[in-house]
């Protein structure tokens, strides 16, 4: 599947940022240089200054409206990210999903050779791609010190499989001793990167040796202190966030306006937005509107026999 014009622009923005990052390892400086190329100031009156949330780790966000193809963008971005890294770096990606349903959908689509996501990955990496679930990783299924040197390996997990209070982290299997991963401990000897008090054969320790590229889907759900600790524990080499609604602590490298989606026929129905002055009025008006739509739906059912159930969706605050 060919990228839409706005998606190509997002990838071009990422490439431009990666180029400035290669010129200067100072994250704040490379961020300023990136925006200066666009004649946009950083700081007062311009875009926010770079936020070094995971100290020393480049972390940027693609702000793309819902329905804009964030997953395809992420798949297309992976090669560009690895291209700016040393060629000998293991091509490991930890892909974090916010829920079990999105996890299952992501695993299915990334693994399906007929799906555009998998086709994009196969094209960029010559078909040398494997997608692993948490169970496969813990069992060492297709995951070895040798395989990560030659194959793009994408590990798909949920936030909750990693995110836990540090005092209880050993309740999670990725922090537990794992004989299936013992060959990694024999192959990698840099003890300085190890997480203190954690068995060296634990999956989290393997990741820390390999320093994966980490993709955070719906990253607005991963802003809590526990989420920051989760990312620190992974010890990534690069973080790519995907969301339609970034929080204030995100470094947004590329913005897509909803009108761009409409131009590309990605939005099939009109989007109508009303502004209200308080949360209470938003809730009351939304429920009342749903009630009016319900009445019309019942009238339609009486005529056609077809029932349409109107619903209201309220987005909860992340934990």
List the predicted regions and their residue ranges.
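Conserved interdomain linker/interface between the two RecA-like ATPase lobes of SF2 helicase motors
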Residues: 252-319
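Conserved helicase ATPase motor motifs in RecA-like P-loop NTPase domains
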Residues: 62-68, 218-222, 232-250, 265
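Inter-Walker segment of RecA-like/P-loop motor cores
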Residues: 118-179, 192-194
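SF2 helicase catalytic motif II
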Residues: 161-164, 171-240
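Motif I (Walker A/P-loop) of helicase-class P-loop NTPases
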Residues: 70-81
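Conserved pre-motif I regulatory segment
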Residues: 1-63
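Short hydrophobic/aromatic beta-strand immediately N-terminal to the Walker A/P-loop
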Residues: 61-63, 94, 313
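Conserved Walker A/P-loop ATP-binding site and its immediately adjacent core
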Residues: 88-122, 158-164, 317
């Amino acid at each position: 599947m060919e990228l839409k014009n706005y998606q190509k622009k997002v990838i071009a923005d990422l490439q431009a940022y990666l180029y400035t990052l290669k010129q200067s390892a100072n994250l704040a400086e490379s961020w300023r240089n990136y925006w200066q190329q666009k004649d946009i100031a950083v700081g007062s009156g311009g875009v926010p200054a770079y936020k070094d949330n995971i100290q020393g780790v480049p972390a940027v966000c693609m702000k793309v409206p819902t329905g804009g193809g964030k997953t395809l963008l992420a798949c297309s971005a992976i090669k560009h990210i690895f291209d700016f890294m040393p060629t000998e770096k293991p091509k490991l990606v930890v892909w974090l999903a916010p829920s079990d349903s999105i996890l299952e959908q992501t695993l299915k689509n990334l693994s399906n050779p007929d799906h555009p996501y998998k086709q994009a990955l196969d094209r960029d990496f010559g078909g040398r791609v494997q997608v692993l679930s948490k169970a496969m990783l813990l069992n060492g299924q297709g995951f070895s010190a040798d395989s990560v040197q030659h194959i793009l390996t994408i590990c798909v997990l949920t936030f909750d499989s990693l995110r836990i209070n540090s005092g209880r982290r050993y309740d999670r299997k990725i922090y537990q001793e794992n004989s299936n991963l013992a060959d990694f401990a024999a192959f990698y000897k840099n003890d300085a990167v190890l997480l203190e008090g954690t068995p060296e054969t634990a999956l989290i320790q393997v990741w820390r040796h390999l320093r994966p590229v980490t993709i955070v889907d719906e990253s607005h759900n991963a802003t809590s202190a526990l989420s920051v600790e989760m990312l620190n524990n992974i010890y990534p080499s690069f973080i790519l966030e995907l969301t339609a609604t970034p929080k204030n602590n995100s470094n947004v490298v590329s913005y897509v306006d909803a009108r761009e989606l409409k131009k590309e026929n990605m939005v099939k129905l009109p989007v109508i937005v009303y502004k209200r002055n308080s949360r209470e009025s938003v809730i009351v008006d939304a429920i009342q509107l749903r009630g009016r739509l319900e009445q019309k739906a019942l009238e339609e059912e009486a005529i056609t026999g077809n029932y349409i159930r109107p619903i209201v969706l309220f987005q909860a605050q992340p934990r």
